[in-house]
């Protein structure tokens, strides 16, 4: 569709712009970025060694493992490519997207022409889920962020990612400093399923 064509044009336009690589969060991005440096995001749903090896063989230079993977299973996921280990990472901070949709859940409140691209959905328990619109899609986020900044070395990975979506520039700077100093998080947060795993 048009969105995919626009994405392909943007990638082609940036190839000589000095970027270190491209983050891919959808399997379709692998085709769009084929032959370019790629790092896999959590949208690829990497939860096991088979998936990790598939993406490594397809050319990912690094990849993010989903927060649904138990800490004891993370080290078994790391793939190899060309006889060398492919770096793996985890989310150390971020509001996880719960749903991505082309239909707008806010359109009953106001039309797109009068929308500031942000909103909130409230569930029956009065929990507020942030909504952000952009690039033709709407993303509904978990209101409680994952935070692992105070647990350095708890997970066997090569790097950590701070995923900023709802935060202001100042809030992001504060969170990065908390991660750098391994400070505890102030407010509600989750550890994902790193220490629980899925059944």
Regions found by a protein language model. Name each.
Residues 1-54, 58-199:
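Active-site pocket-lining/capping segments in soluble small-molecule metabolic enzymes
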